[in-house]
A protein has these predicted regions:
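A short core secondary-structure module
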Residues: 140, 146-183
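A short, Trp-centered hydrophobic/proline-enriched beta-strand micro-motif
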Residues: 114-123
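A structural signal for short hydrophobic beta-strand segments in well-ordered beta-sheet cores
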Residues: 134-136
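Glycine-rich phosphate/cofactor-binding loops in nucleotide/flavin-utilizing enzymes
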Residues: 2-5, 17, 68, 72, ...
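C-terminal helix-coil-helix/basic helical segment that borders enzyme active sites and/or dimer interfaces
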Residues: 24-34, 249, 253-261, 276-309, ...
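Glycine-rich beta->alpha junctions and the first turn(s) of the following alpha-helix
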Residues: 3-8, 182-280, 346, 371-372
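Internal helix-loop-helix
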Residues: 47-114, 152-158, 293, 341-344
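Glycine-rich phosphate/pyrophosphate-binding beta-alpha loops
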Residues: 148-153, 228, 345-352
Length: 372
């Protein structure tokens, strides 16, 4: 639980709080974003505080922090609700974890150093008739198909693409984005500000040496990365709930034209109590899931529970916060209005809530896995 952290994890939290102080000191541009100079300063601060390498493997100079340590830091950063948290961590290995030889030299290491950018091409468009396919042809694979919701794909130097090989095995291929036949056919933006592209692969020749692992390992590699991201989203959700709680408490305790603070009203207190219950339960769920993940067992089901519960609780908490603050919370640019748009996507990212519910039930009823 958050209050029973050992000294090492309390130190992680203290360093994250120091990084938050650095974020507060940054000047913002006209759009409310961190400037280029500010980004460089925050990246330097993250290295100084030992945060930058937490997401990176030891073999590459990182500290390769565990799930609980990352949860503590991510929750602390999110609780500040400030631009700049993205600069706390260095790029993680993602599906390239464990890559050797050419893939390590030309893709993994440059990505970890920030020299190259990667994007994850996993999802087919809804109207796709088949999976993106890679046909073996001599010393190359010939890739045809389409991927949607490739976040950051327009800026990526290379793509990690889930493909189906002859015979049906799924695999991950590393594809340079400037390869002939890789076509960005649509750019779009989601409500929280994420930038995505739809990419078509038209007879794209990819060296066989760009196969990550072995045929059949594509889905397990992808799901390992997705699992890490789900826990990240749960930690972000709980941190944002802490920020909302503090904001609403200040509002309810403030002077009111009636002469009595809103927080003195019984109906308001009932709704605020519901928010607190959601936040307490979410944090308990999150921290238990992180500890299970650190224990070395397969924590896929527990992480699913944390992701679904925490992101849905966040939606309820933000919605009630707007109700308690009133109409001005819907004014464009109000922090709750911005948060309302931002958090809705969390219930869909890395697996929509009901899809994850089905997987959770399958884990127990079909595979007899998972803890309560």
């Amino acid at each position: 639980m958050p209050e029973s952290l050992d000294s090492t994890h309390r130190e992680h939290r203290a360093r994250a709080q120091q990084f938050v102080a650095r974020m507060r000191a940054q000047a913002l541009d006209a759009r409310g974003h961190i400037t280029a100079a500010g980004a460089a300063e925050l990246t330097s601060a993250a290295r100084e505080l030992g945060l930058h390498g937490m997401t990176q493997p030891r073999a590459s100079g990182g500290s390769e922090a565990g799930a609980l340590a990352l949860t503590v830091v991510r929750e602390t950063l999110a609780a500040a609700n400030l631009p700049g948290a993205r600069y706390a961590f260095g790029p993680g290995p993602g599906v390239l974890a464990g890559a050797e030889g050419e893939l390590r030299r030309d893709y993994l290491e440059p990505m970890l150093r920030g020299v190259k950018r990667a994007a994850f091409a996993f999802t087919e468009p809804r109207n796709a008739l088949q999976h993106t396919h890679a046909r073996a042809e001599g010393d190359a694979f010939v890739v045809n198909g389409e991927k949607a919701y490739v976040t950051g794909g327009a800026e990526a130097d290379f793509l990690n693409v889930l493909v189906e090989l002859d015979g049906g095995a799924r695999a991950m291929l590393v594809v340079d984005r400037d390869t002939a036949g890789v076509n960005l056919v649509e750019h779009f933006r989601s409500t929280e500000g994420g930038q995505h592209v739809r990419i078509q692969f038209d007879n794209v020749r990819v060296p066989t040496s760009h196969l990550l692992g072995k045929p059949g390992q594509g889905i397990p590699r992808a799901m390992l990365q997705i699992g890490h991201t789900r826990l990240l989203l749960a930690a972000e959700a709980t941190g944002l709930m802490l920020w909302v709680d503090a904001y609403v408490a200040d509002h309810l305790l403030a002077a009111h034209p009636t002469g009595t603070p809103l927080g003195a009203r019984e109906g308001v207190r009932l709704r605020y109590a519901d928010m607190r219950i959601d936040i307490f339960t979410s944090r308990s769920t999150l921290y238990r899931a992180a500890r299970i993940a650190d224990s070395g067992v397969n924590a896929m089901n527990e992480v699913v529970i944390a992701k679904v519960f925490c992101t849905e609780a966040l939606g309820r908490v933000v919605d009630m916060a707007i109700q308690l603050v009133g109409g001005r919370a819907l004014d464009a640019g109000h922090p709750l209005e911005q948060l309302y748009r931002r958090v809705r996507s969390l219930r869909i990212a890395e697996g929509a809530s009901d899809l994850l519910r089905l997987n959770l039930a399958k884990g127990r009823l079909d595979l007899n896995k998972g803890n309560l």
